[in-house]
Amino acid sequence: RYVSWLPLAHVFGQLVDNHYWVRRALHMSIVDSPLNTVDYAKEVQPHLFISVPRIYEKVYSNLKAAIETKAILKIGLKIPLLSSIFKKKLRQAAGFGSNRFSISGAAPINPKILEFFHYLGIPIYEGYGMTENTAGISINYGGGNKIGSVGKCMPFFDLKIASDGEVLIKGDNVMKGYYKNPKATEETIIDGWLQTGDVGKIDSDGYLFITGRKKEIYVSSSGKNVAPLVIEESMKSIPIVSQCFLVGDNRKFCSALITLDMSVILRDHIGVDVNEIPKDPSKQNEMILANDKKLS
């Protein structure tokens, strides 16, 4: 079973929804809206689940909140004889009761979240790729997983790090070029190597770690190179923070634009039951404003 919510306008959605599910004879359930993805997972209990980090972050936040507020869960998970029973119930409640393999991609995911899911017995693995190389170049998997990395290079492809730290890719999965844009193609594919624009490193075991985007690295007025990705992801580990955008080019200091997670405010600060929180952010905001009026 597989829950499909990836946009078919993207190559990864095309790869999985139009090819992989046929080859593997998967029963595919198509989500009517990305906002309902987790609800579909709870109903379908898919064996395969593919997502961006944000959905895993939401599931993680709700599970952690449930554990913190329910003493029986908090205590039960610490007792060896009961731990497996409670973990199974939590997996089922989150929509991962039958899950065999899950992929996280498109953006970095906090290692703490992956560690928590693996602790519960939910096998979520981080991978890496882009449209220009047909979605995938490296991935973690059972028996070959290093949390914090995006895995090892897949067979039949080549991967290396340039002198400036940029990740370079070579293989039959790399595109021929951009449609009717030879200039962009020449700048992106040099001597057969795809210039990804991502900065990373490969450790002694062959695992790839992405540390930032080449074009996003900026220089402060004091001359220090700043990779915003690491700081942004650290800020997003705070439950109430939804998104974070760092700026500081040619400045003495870094500033951050932060958006709050309305569902966490409703759940943790107003006391609304998770199942009663609307999926639509605008409706979440209306609930918060209505609560503020009551308090005033």
Where are these regions (language model features)?
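Conserved AMP-binding/adenylation subdomain of ANL enzymes
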Residues: R1, L8-K89, S98, Y119
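Membrane-embedded alpha-helical bundles of multi-pass transporters/translocases
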Residues: V22, K201, D205, L246-G248
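Conserved ATP-binding loop and adjacent catalytic segment of the adenylate-forming AMP-binding
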Residues: M28-V31, S98-S104, P111-G165, N173-K176, ...
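Alpha-helix/helix-capping structural signal
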Residues: R54-E57, S61, A107-P108, N173, ...
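Alpha-helix-centered segments that form part of catalytic cores
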Residues: L77-P111, I288-S296
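Conserved ATP-binding/catalytic segment of the ANL
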Residues: C153-S220
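Adenylate-forming
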Residues: V174, I189, Y207-K236, I265-A290
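C-terminal boundary motif of the adenylate-forming
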Residues: V199, I238-M262
